[in-house]
């Protein structure tokens, strides 16, 4: 059923006999030069080259460029051009050493200024430089970074994503709190009303005559010795409208309770009559 720990321990539910027909894992993978049974699993030469180029490009994009190496490469090119000019003038033999050195220095200054201008101008990758960029990953990394900077500027995104994600909501909330007016909540209103500076300025809801009448009643109660609250300017008199509303509410509650008791009495009487009928003998 199984061979070398490979296979099914039981054929039940597998819709097969459970026996291994071939052992593919024991066969060596054929090379690209000698394609055999596994040729359809292999990549062609063109696909292999395309994959290698993609890997090199990704590798160059991930790695950071070394600025010193690029600067050294530019200086080396300048010195190579100067040495070629110096060798050419020395072979001709028409000029002296001072003139040759002066021309070489002039060429060196010109090439240095030219390369400095090329660094300031952002250039894209051309097809002629693709092979050179694939070999020099530092240069490819610099150009890739320039492309990413242009993309970031185009989409107007910040360089520090953590600051953009964490600080922006907090700053927005802080600005909204500063701009929004102070909310007059119920707790703050009650605290201001309880404060001693506002007790004397509490709005008077009722007329003066009603307040005088209530103060007279309170003074009479104090004279009779009945317990009551101290009458002062800060005590609130009861509204006659509130008293009438409470009186009407009490009357309605009494009428409702009276109706409920009447319904309960009628219900009990009906239940008693039904019980009497059930106890009475049948007429036949």
UniProtKB/Swiss-Prot annotation:
The keyword Cytoplasm applies. Keywords: Coiled coil, Cytoplasm, mRNA processing, mRNA splicing, Nucleus, Spliceosome. It comes from the Eukaryota. Pfam families: cwf21. Residues 70-114 form the CWF21 domain. GO terms for cellular component: cytoplasm; nucleus; spliceosomal complex. Residues 148-284 are annotated as: Disordered. Residues 148-196, 229-243, 250-284 have a biased composition (Basic and acidic residues). GO terms for biological process: mRNA processing; RNA splicing. The keyword NADP does not apply. Its main location: cytoplasm. It is found in: Cytoplasm; Nucleus. Residues 71-118 form a coiled coil. Associates with the NTC complex (or PRP19-associated complex). The NTC complex associates with the spliceosome after the release of the U1 and U4 snRNAs and forms the CWC spliceosome subcomplex reminiscent of a late-stage spliceosome. Involved in pre-mRNA splicing. May function at or prior to the first catalytic step of splicing at the catalytic center of the spliceosome. May do so by stabilizing the catalytic center or the position of the RNA substrate. Belongs to the CWC21 family. This is Pre-mRNA-splicing factor CWC21. The lineage of its organism: Eukaryota, Fungi, Dikarya, Ascomycota, Saccharomycotina.
């Amino acid at each position: 059923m199984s061979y070398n720990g490979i296979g099914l321990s039981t054929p039940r539910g597998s819709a097969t006999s459970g026996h291994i027909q071939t052992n593919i894992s024991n066969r060596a993978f054929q090379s690209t030069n000698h394609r055999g049974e596994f040729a359809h699993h292999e990549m062609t030469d063109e696909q292999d080259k395309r994959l290698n180029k993609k890997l090199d490009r990704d590798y160059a994009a991930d790695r950071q460029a070394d600025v010193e190496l690029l600067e050294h490469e530019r200086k080396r090119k300048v010195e190579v051009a100067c040495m070629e000019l110096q060798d050419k003038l020395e072979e001709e033999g028409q000029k002296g050493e001072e003139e040759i050195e002066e021309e070489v220095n002039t060429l060196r200054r010109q090439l240095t200024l030219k390369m400095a201008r090329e660094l300031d101008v952002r250039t894209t990758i051309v097809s002629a430089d693709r092979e050179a960029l694939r070999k020099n990953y530092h240069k490819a990394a610099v150009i890739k970074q320039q492309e990413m900077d242009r993309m970031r500027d185009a989409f107007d995104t910040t360089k520090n994503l953590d600051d953009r994600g964490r600080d922006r909501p907090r700053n927005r909330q802080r600005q909204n709190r500063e701009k929004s007016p102070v909310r007059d909540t119920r707790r703050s209103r009650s605290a201001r009303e309880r404060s001693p500076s506002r007790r004397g300025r509490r709005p008077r809801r009722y007329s003066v005559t009603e307040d005088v009448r209530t103060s007279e009643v309170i003074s009479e109660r104090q004279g009779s010795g009945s317990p009551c609250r101290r009458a002062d300017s800060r005590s609130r008199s009861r509204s006659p409208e509130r008293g009438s509303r409470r009186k009407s509410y009490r009357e309605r509650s009494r009428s409702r309770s009276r109706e409920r008791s009447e319904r309960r009495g009628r219900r009990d009487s009906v239940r008693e009559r039904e019980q009497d009928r059930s106890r009475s003998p049948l007429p036949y």
